[in-house]
């Protein structure tokens, strides 16, 4: 029996482990499916992290490193390269790893820190053919920042969330030509700071109330057709613009990683698709 099992070694899991240890808990186990702690922070090589927590500007890996260093001075146990398969309502965690094999870990308490995943092209129903060259912004970020692969040369970004804005800047700095950022809403979904630093500073146009109405290409993306959206949320005929691109990045929102949450029988919020939590962040299972 473990006092606290934390599923996920990203920013939420790391912060939870540090706070639990600080609060006096001594039997803590972090389960992380990747080969290192940090989660999404490891691919966020831009700065802007840590200002509130540490009083200075840090990159994502530096921010994660601060928490990892804090954990080194504790007795928190970490199990990497471990995939959690199931969480039962009676707080049994089923997981598997190369080193430990199949395990069933009983916990007094569980912190769910699985994070989220990106919406894909299929989730938003973008019409057109299905050529190579369409990526989520996060996948492109990992390829460029961690794997060392350039995903394209002429880029159009759909969605103006922060990760899309940041990737507009990153792709430009890596030598690509970002033709535009297209946003279906009449306002941007990202921070004003990111619009200024990632779009305006690089003369990348932002088209509000616009969306992609067609993707063309056989083996690889060749063109993207963009049109203005009317008050009825439908494309306005005659407003189409044609962009010659070989890459489209999607920054169209995030979805909670909630499969384990559902398995545990936790009450779900149909609006957010995540767990219903109370003021102390407890779920419906005490």
Regions found by a protein language model. Give the residues of each.
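Residues forming the flavin
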Residues: 1-286
């Amino acid at each position: 029996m473990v006092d606290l099992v934390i599923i996920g070694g990203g920013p939420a899991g790391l912060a939870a482990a540090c706070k639990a240890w600080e609060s006096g808990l001594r039997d803590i186990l972090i389960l992380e499916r990747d080969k290192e702690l940090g989660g999404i922070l490891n691919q966020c090589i831009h700065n802007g992290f840590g200002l509130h927590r540490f009083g200075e500007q840090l990159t994502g890996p530096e921010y994660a490193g601060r928490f990892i260093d804090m954990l080194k001075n504790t007795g928190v146990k970490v199990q990497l390269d471990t995939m959690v398969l199931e969480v039962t309502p009676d707080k049994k965690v089923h997981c598997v790893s190369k080193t430990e094999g199949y395990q069933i870990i009983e916990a007094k308490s569980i912190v769910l820190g699985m994070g989220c995943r990106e919406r894909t092209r299929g989730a938003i129903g973008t019409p057109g053919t299905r050529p190579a060259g369409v990526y989520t912004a996060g996948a492109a970020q990992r390829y460029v920042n961690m794997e060392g692969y350039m995903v394209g040369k002429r880029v159009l970004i759909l969605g103006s969330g922060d990760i899309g804005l940041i990737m507009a800047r990153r792709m430009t700095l890596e030598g690509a030509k970002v033709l535009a950022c297209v946003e279906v809403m009449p306002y941007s979904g990202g921070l004003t700071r990111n619009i200024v630093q990632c779009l305006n500073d690089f003369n990348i146009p932002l088209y509000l109330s616009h969306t992609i109405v067609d993707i063309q290409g056989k083996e690889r993306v060749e063109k993207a057709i963009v049109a203005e959206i009317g008050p009825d949320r439908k494309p306005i005929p005659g407003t189409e613009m044609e962009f010659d691109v070989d890459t489209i990045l999607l920054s169209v929102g995030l979805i909670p990683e909630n499969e384990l949450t559902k398995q545990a029988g936790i009450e779900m919020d149909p609006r957010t698709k995540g767990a219903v939590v109370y003021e102390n962040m407890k779920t419906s299972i005490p």
